[in-house]
C-alpha cells in the first residue's frame, strides 16, 4: 500500500510540473482528493509551514473551490492564517519569479524562490518537489527526527547553510538506497506518520 501510494504521488508531482494541474488522491490515508495548479501548490506549501499537512490540504481544496485565501486558511484551521494570507497574496503577485524558477535547475530555482516573502529553504524545496523535482530535500521535524534515530547529529537551528549540509547527508543516503530524494522523503514521512501525503 505504501509503495503504491509513493509511486502514485511521484507521478502526480511530475504531472503537476509538466501539465500545470493534477488531482492528488490521498486515499486510503485521507478520504478526499485535491485538484491542484502550480499557483495553488505554491499556496499550499506556504500554508503548511508550522501547521499540519492536513490543514494545508483542506486549505488547498477550499482555494480550488473558489474560497478566498484568508477565508480558506481560517476555515481549514491553518495556523498563523493572517500572516500566511499576506505571504500567499504577495507570492501570487510575484508569480513571474515562480515561472522563472520553474525554468531553472533545482538549486538555482530554489535561490529564485527564496526572493518571495514567506518562502524559506523548506517551503521552496517543498514546492519544487511537489512540481516534480526529485533532487531537493524537504527538511522538516519528521525528517530531522528520522535522522536522529539513524544516529546523525541534527542542528538545533536551521540556517540556510545547515539546511544544505543536512540535504547533502540526505542525498548521500538516498543514493545509497537507490532512490531519489523525493521518493525517500515520502517513504520517511510514511514511516514517521503512517501516511503518504505531500
From Swiss-Prot:
Species whose genome carries this gene: Archaeoglobus fulgidus (strain ATCC 49558 / DSM 4304 / JCM 9628 / NBRC 100126 / VC-16)
What this chain does, per the record?
A: Catalyzes the excision of an oxidatively damaged form of guanine (7,8-dihydro-8-oxoguanine = 8-oxoG) from DNA. Also cleaves the DNA backbone at apurinic/apyrimidinic sites (AP sites). Efficiently cleaves oligomers containing 8-oxoG:C and 8-oxoG:G base pairs, and is less effective on oligomers containing 8-oxoG:T and 8-oxoG:A mispairs.
Protein name, as recorded: 8-oxoguanine DNA glycosylase/AP lyase
Key word Transcription present in the record?
Answer: no
Q: How does it assemble?
A: Monomer.
Enumerate the GO terms in the molecular function aspect: class I DNA-(apurinic or apyrimidinic site) endonuclease activity; hydrolase activity, hydrolyzing N-glycosyl compounds
Entry annotated with the keyword DNA damage: yes
Active site per the UniProt annotation: 122, 140
Record-listed E.C. numbers: 3.2.2.-, 4.2.99.18
Amino acid at each position: 500500500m505504501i509503495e503504491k501510494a509513493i509511486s502514485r504521488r511521484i507521478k502526480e508531482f511530475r504531472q503537476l510540473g509538466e501539465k500545470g494541474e493534477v488531482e492528488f488522491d490521498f486515499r486510503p490515508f485521507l478520504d478526499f482528493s485535491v485538484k491542484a495548479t502550480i499557483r495553488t501548490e505554491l499556496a499550499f506549501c506556504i500554508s503548511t509551514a508550522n501547521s499540519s499537512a492536513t490543514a494545508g490540504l483542506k486549505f488547498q481544496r477550499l482555494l480550488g473551490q473558489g474560497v478566498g485565501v484568508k477565508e480558506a486558511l481560517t476555515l481549514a484551521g491553518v495556523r498563523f492564517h493572517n500572516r500566511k494570507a499576506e505571504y500567499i497574496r504577495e507570492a501570487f503577485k510575484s508569480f513571474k519569479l515562480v515561472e522563472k524558477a520553474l525554468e531553472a535547475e533545482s538549486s538555482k530555482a530554489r535561490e529564485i524562490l527564496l526572493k518571495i516573502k514567506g518562502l524559506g529553504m523548506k517551503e521552496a524545496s517543498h514546492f519544487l518537489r511537489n512540481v516534480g523535482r526529485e533532487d531537493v530535500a524537504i527538511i522538516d521535524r519528521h525528517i530531522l527526527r528520522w535522522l536522529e534515530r539513524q544516529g546523525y547529529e541534527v542542528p538545533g537551528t536551521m540556517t540556510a547553510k545547515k539546511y544544505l549540509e543536512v540535504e547533502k547527508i540526505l542525498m548521500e543516503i538516498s543514493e545509497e538506497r537507490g532512490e531519489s530524494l523525493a521518493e525517500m522523503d515520502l517513504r520517511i514521512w510514511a514511516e514517521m506518520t503512517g501516511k503518504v501525503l505531500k
